[in-house]
Amino acid sequence: MMNAKNVFFNDIYIHMITISLILFYTVISSLYILLNDDYNIILRIFVIFIIAAAVILMMKKETFLPFLGLTVLPSPLIANEKIPTGANLSYTINMSEHPDGTLIVYWAANKTDAIIEDPFEAYKNYNNVGVSKVKNGKAEVRIFCPDRYKVNKVFNQLLERHFHYRIVFKETGFLSPVMTVKVNC
């Protein structure tokens, strides 16, 4: 049986390494063609666009961490509204570009009053989660103060308090890419 850490290592790290190698090779090969006078001028101009596309992909977090991007989940599986019982913090998200009734799903690290050693422990059992409905162009997020946690495997850093959310597009089943809001508490 695979646990979440094994899935993370096997799928995500392999994906990150593969994409990094492909993008690195693309940029190096394109630079070689661009800087070599033996190649046709049209090809050399074309590789400028290839380099630009590779750089744009490198700058997007979803390129390396695809689970943060657009995804699909049948909207009937998402509760209408849910607030963590006893949540004591409230944040308002401007959703004026979305119609009233649009749902957002949100989640934050658990509250333990300690720095948590890894993301899997930080979100364990997903106790600090909810679903909010847009009303008058705003969505209210109610959570407990999330703890800071460490990400040691890739970035080796301490992440400050924050919560994530996705917008639910009911008609299509799409969920927006993950968005993050920093929290002061």
Annotate each predicted stretch with a short phrase.
Residues 38-50:
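Hydrophobic alpha-helical transmembrane segments
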Residues 25, 49-56:
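Hydrophobic cores of alpha-helical transmembrane segments in multi-pass integral membrane proteins
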Residues 23-36:
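N-terminal signal sequences
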Residues 1-26:
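Juxtamembrane interface helix immediately N-terminal to a transmembrane segment
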Residues 2-9, 30-33, 43-46, 55-185:
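Beta-strand-dominated extracellular/periplasmic modules and repeats
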